[in-house]
């Protein structure tokens, strides 16, 4: 979600007032230390004046001057940025535990049950327990396999709905974003909650309209991505000058009501089923764990259920659909890629059925398209910020405890040191390559690495690969009339996820046998 103009205006107005009061000269780095190189900060605002609407690009330009390890200040907080695979390895692998903490923000406090989720939780016993729970209970290979039918059913529904939209468009362009979000949200909702709460049931009504759920997700990404003055200039925290904290509290109450509804419904089903109860979704799994008082209490279950909501429904739905929209954008700009993908799909799958998950290992070019999209358009260009838990040093430079650490994976993915012609979309670069997206290859980190790596990456990767494969297999693709490949707008909009600024529209026509779409 883009930072709004009025938010920046209010922020700058506050800064101007403070500068007028203080009338101090520009600051400089403290003497007698070995901090990494970087631009001199201004009083109060630090280097925030150098950060534009696309921070990953602004910071990339600064790193060209100051190097792959750079010191900045955001307000009163020291920030270190790593912009190379070597720095990524240092922060995320070699010294992972040193930099495994998170900064304390108003959004983390008010939108995640006081830092109870895996994303914003400090590195403590709660985080380690939740992380272990994700790995062993929620995202085990067996658990993901048990949800495979859900993924296939929702992808089939996507093909059917997109075919109907194409028929209704009569050769005109079809907006894709809504279809992609509905598909990913349907998968994640059913896996986590057991059903699509934004979908009406027979004889009843939806717990939340799809547009309301979408709005709640947008609000989450806005509030977790804005420049909140109080986070960086603590003097103004209590004033809530921009009104963000008030909105965070309102969001929290709305999410809490929805979450209570989900928990009550699941608990009632357990009560009715009695001994015949069988867990069918991740909330059920969490509630079963709560039966053992030595493992989880209700408050912890509630917090961890919100983890599933916000890090899977909120995060998974949005990040997966954003990645797919970028992938399809690049394919439309590169017809030779579309041609190669079509040949591979026709050879492996044929034209009388949809692509199944079992087909993916036999579709290396499709896998390469997804990797290349993640290289050029990582959904979180600088990952979530890390925080140094203790003093550290790298390449002769000191990083004091309490320093906020950013890893610019967008810059690493565009670095000619690691990639030939990095600005070109070339899936072929991954054909025969062992480079993967699972956090072991520092040149390609769409999900991060180490202890803070996205816990749901395996599910997200399955969803993206399956849907991209079926989109390319099920339809012919073209740009809207009058739009050339060079004219397709590829501008970004920054936030917790960095999406296309303008939603993708394409001319689509079903090309498989009719029964596939029925």
Give short role names for the model-derived ranges:
Residues 395, 432-464, 489-494:
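Cytochrome P450 heme-thiolate "Cys pocket" and heme-binding signature region
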Residues 48-61, 65-67, 257, 356-396, ...:
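Conserved cytochrome P450 K-helix E-x-x-R motif and the immediately C-terminal K′/meander segment
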Residues 100, 335-337, 457-497:
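Cytochrome P450 heme-binding "Cys pocket" and the immediately downstream C-terminal segment
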Residues 103-111, 145-324, 340, 357-358:
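Cytochrome P450 heme-thiolate monooxygenase catalytic core
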Residues 1-30, 462:
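Terminal signal-anchor or tail-anchor transmembrane helices
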Residues 30-48, 57-150, 176, 180, ...:
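Cytochrome P450 substrate-recognition site 1
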Residues 2-4, 496-518:
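C-terminal helix/juxtamembrane-tail motif
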Residues 360, 391, 407-435:
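Conserved cytochrome P450 K-helix/beta-meander segment immediately N-terminal to the heme-binding cysteine loop
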